[in-house]
């Protein structure tokens, strides 16, 4: 069992079961997560573990970050992430989290940043239906239609679905199955698609809403 781990999405492929079934999987490269800080309820008000992965050039590390990594006696990574430790597991600064904490068949939640789509209209962004192609409609085929009432309330309600920036948001896909754990190559093979583009950072943790799809 683990509180979670940070990895990088490599892409998608497929593997075959012993019965010859094709299973689509996402390959996630998980370098050892180095623990840079352990937070507790007594000192920080909540229990969490701060980790870093990868490496960064010294010229790209601020003095504050350099001091933080030096205190943890670990190499500066490309970023820091916090993993909540609500179960109260014991961790030490300088330790590592690896793929060995996961096992095949385990259900996980994967969080990442979705692909950015730029400025999108309501048809693409919110799945609105298009208006008539003919019958007097010349300019409003993909227009959203009315966005409110008249003088009462005299404004557009907050949260109204309209055109705007689509994607590039934090997204979590729940209850994905770990198909294979490759300890030698630090890889996790997870059934199905996970949020984000290849090369993006993702956060994997045990599923919070366990569901039996069998």
From Swiss-Prot:
Entry-annotated residues carrying N5-methylglutamine: 151
PTM remark: Methylated by PrmB.
GO molecular function, one term: rRNA binding
Pfam families registered for this protein in UniProt: Ribosomal_L3
Transmembrane segments: none
PANTHER family noted in UniProt: 50S RIBOSOMAL PROTEIN L3 (PTHR11229), LARGE RIBOSOMAL SUBUNIT PROTEIN UL3C (PTHR11229:SF16)
Name recorded for this polypeptide: Large ribosomal subunit protein uL3
Species, as recorded: Teredinibacter turnerae (strain ATCC 39867 / T7901)
